[in-house]
């Protein structure tokens, strides 16, 4: 029987996908305050994000990413396209994926959930709000990872 073992915060890894370096730096600062031992990897495009996930899934040299944070509005491949691609890939579809955007449009939010996003965060937000969001996300996904794997549920 295979189970997912509990992940310690020092082993928890987040992939951040954002074409805006300033926003990525804000997320990094907020994450340092929210969960200082969590590792953050940043790529600047959705295509790079897909490639990163496929490579890490194939080679496991860094270990699997535990959570993906993806901006919705990016050039070339949008956040919508990224979510569809990841959730449509049998090897990647279980990857927890949180979309964030300046759009609070109900249609955008609904579309993200219909494509398979696990959560949606609207910005702008204060640094304090960002820290609280990241604390909650990391705590939630650490709890999920500590649940018994599918083999135990049969």
Regions flagged by a language model, labelled:
Residues 103-107:
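Negatively charged, flexible loop motifs adjacent to catalytic sites
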Residues 74:
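Receiver (REC) domain active-site loop signature in two-component systems and cognate sites
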Residues 118:
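Short, glycine/charged-rich "phosphate-handling" switch motifs in NTP-dependent
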Residues 1-15, 21-39, 47, 54, ...:
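Non-catalytic signal-transmission and effector/linker regions of two-component phosphorelay proteins
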Residues 35, 57-63, 87-94, 115:
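Conserved phosphotransfer cores of two-component systems
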Residues 71, 101:
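Active-site residues of response regulator receiver
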Residues 123:
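A Lys-centered signature of the CheY-like receiver
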